Regions:
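Helical element adjacent to the flavin cofactor pocket in flavoenzyme catalytic cores
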Residues: 121-184, 188-192, 196
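Active-site-proximal substrate-binding core of FAD-dependent oxidoreductases
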Residues: 373-380
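FAD-binding beta-loop-beta segment adjacent to the flavin cofactor pocket
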Residues: 261-267, 318-345, 349-352
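A conserved FAD-binding loop/helix module that cradles the flavin
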Residues: 350-372
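Mobile amphipathic helical/loop "lid" adjacent to a hydrophobic cofactor/ligand pocket
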Residues: 2-120, 128
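Short loop/edge segments at beta-strand edges and connector loops
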Residues: 3, 163-165, 347
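Mid-domain catalytic core of redox enzymes
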Residues: 165-289, 293-303, 308
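General small-molecule cofactor/ligand-binding pocket signal
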Residues: 160-162, 311-314, 344
Length: 380
C-alpha cells in the first residue's frame, strides 16, 4: 500500500524557541519532478524544520552527495554523522530536528554514533531515485502478507522449508561446505549453502580461522543495534496521519498508525500504532510496564488523546537486530562471497550499498543467489 510521497516530522511542544505552542507536524511533500529536484522542492517549502539560511546550508552541505560522489561518502566512514554535519557548517537545529530521527529510523543508532558514510549513502540513494523515500506498508501482518506467500511459492516448486532445526555447525570437506549439523545431531547434505542470518549468528557459524580472512573478517567485528518494537492499540483514532512519522526528541523516532494506513490489521475506525523504539540500549533492562508508560508520556506530546484512549500494548524486544553502523563499520561489511567457493552470506549487514532494512536484505539475497547459480554453472 503505497503512501503519498511525503515525509512527516513531528516536533513536541517546547522543541524550539522559533515558534510557540505545539505539537508541530511538518510535511515534506515531494513533487513529480525528477530526483533530486523533487526532494529539493520539498525542502524549499518547509516552514519549521529549516529556515531560509538552513535551506541554503543544506543544499551546499550535501552537494557532494547530491552529485553522486560515492568515493566522497566512503571517505567519511571513520567519523560520525554529527561530526560531518558540523564540519559542513549545518546547524544544530537541523541536526536534532531532521537528521537525528532519520538516524534512529535507519539504524536504531543515535546521530552521534552512526557513521557519516551510512547516512550519506541513504541521502545519495534518495537523491538518485525519484521514489526512494516514499513509504509503503503491507496490507496486514508481515507473516501473513509477505513471509507465508513467499514460503507457499517455494513449496509449490518443491522446496522444503523447516524452521525447527537450529544449526549447530557447518560441515566442510576440503575447500567446500558439504552441509550442516543440527543441535539434535542430524546432518543435512548441501551442494551450496547460504548463511541468511543476523550478523552475530553468522559469526557463530563461520569457523574461527575463516573469520580472519579479509573477505569475511568483518563478520566477527560488526556489532548489532538493540530495538524494541512497540504495538499500541487505542479505542479511537488519535492521529490524522496515515504515513510514517518521524518524532523528534522522543521514544517515537519513527512510527505509523497502521489502523489507518493498513486495513489488513482489522482495527477499523481506531488507531493501532507501531513504533520502533530507539535507541533501546538503556531500555532493555526495564520491565514492559515502565517502557509503555514512557512511550505513552511521549505520545501524549504529539497526540493529546493517547492516554485516555489507550487499550493495550505489546512489546517485542530485539537485543541484536540490524548491524550497528558505527564509524568504521561500513568498510567491515562483507560481500556475499566467502573463502569457501560454495558458501555465501546474505543479510542486511552485507555490502550491497543499501541501509540495513528489508530492502537491503533482499538485495543481499539476490547477490547470494547469483553466487550459487554461478557456482552451479561452473560445476555443470
Amino acid at each position: 500500500l503505497w503512501q503519498p510521497h511525503t515525509l512527516t516530522y513531528a516536533m513536541p511542544p517546547g522543541w524550539s524557541d522559533r515558534w510557540e505552542g505545539g505539537p508541530i507536524f511538518e510535511e515534506f511533500h515531494f513533487t513529480d519532478a525528477p530526483s533530486p529536484f523533487n526532494g529539493i522542492g520539498a525542502v524549499l517549502n518547509a516552514k519549521y524544520v529549516f529556515n531560509t539560511l538552513e535551506k541554503l546550508l543544506f543544499a551546499t552541505g550535501t552537494l557532494p552527495v547530491l552529485v553522486g560522489d560515492q568515493k566522497y561518502a566512503e571517505r567519511q566512514d571513520d567519523i560520525s554523522y554529527s561530526t560531518w554535519h558540523r564540519k559542513r557548517g549545518m546547524s544544530e537545529h537541523m541536526l536534532r530536528t531532521f537528521f537525528a530521527p532519520m538516524s534512529l529510523a535507519l539504524n536504531f543508532t543515535h546521530i552521534d554514533d552512526i557513521s557519516a558514510e551510512a547516512m550519506l549513502r541513504v541521502m545519495a540513494y534518495f537523491a538518485s531515485s525519484k521514489d526512494a523515500s516514499r513509504a509503503g506498508f503491507l496490507d496486514g501482518p508481515p507473516g501473513d502478507r509477505l513471509i507465508e506467500p513467499i514460503a507457499e511459492y517455494l513449496r509449490k516448486r518443491g522446496v522444503a522449508i523447516d524452521t525447527s532445526v537450529p544449526i549447530a555447525e557447518l560441515l566442510f570437506e576440503g575447500d567446500r561446505c558439504v552441509g550442516a549439523r543440527t543441535n539434535d545431531g542430524r546432518t543435512y547434505d548441501a551442494d551450496s549453502v547460504i548463511i541468511a542470518t543476523p550478523v552475530h549468528n553468522a559469526a557463530q557459524l563461520l569457523p574461527g580461522e575463516m573469520l580472519r580472512d579479509p573477505l569475511v573478517h568483518g563478520v566477527g567485528k560488526l556489532t548489532s543495534s538493540p530495538v524494541i518494537n512497540a504495538h499500541l492499540w487505542f479505542d479511537k483514532p488519535i492521529s490524522r496521519y496515515s504515513n510514517l512519522i518521524f518524532g523528534c526528541g522522543t521514544l517515537l523516532p519513527v512510527h505509523a498508525d497502521l489502523g489507518q494506513a493498513s486495513p489488513g490489521y482489522e482495527w477499523p475506525g481506531k488507531s493501532f500504532i507501531e513504533i520502533c523504539v530507539a535507541p533501546a540500549d538503556d531500555l532493555m533492562k526495564l520491565d514492559d510496564s515502565t517502557i509503555v508508560e514512557r512511550i505513552l508520556t511521549d505520545m501524549q506530546k504529539f497526540y493529546p488523546l493517547a492516554r485516555e484512549s489507550f487499550v493495550k500494548a505489546k512489546l517485542v524486544r530485539v537485543p541484536k537486530s540490524v548491524y550497528r553502523a558505527s564509524p568504521g563499520a561500513e568498510k567491515l561489511r562483507p560481500g556475499a562471497r566467502t573463502p569457501v567457493q560454495n558458501l555465501f552470506l546474505a543479510g542486511c549487514y552485507t555490502n550491497h550499498r543499501f541501509p540495513a532494512s528489508i530492502e537491503g536484505a533482499m538485495r543481499s539475497a539476490r547477490h547470494a543467489a547469483d553466487g550459487v547459480l554461478e557456482y552451479a554453472g561452473a560445476r555443470a
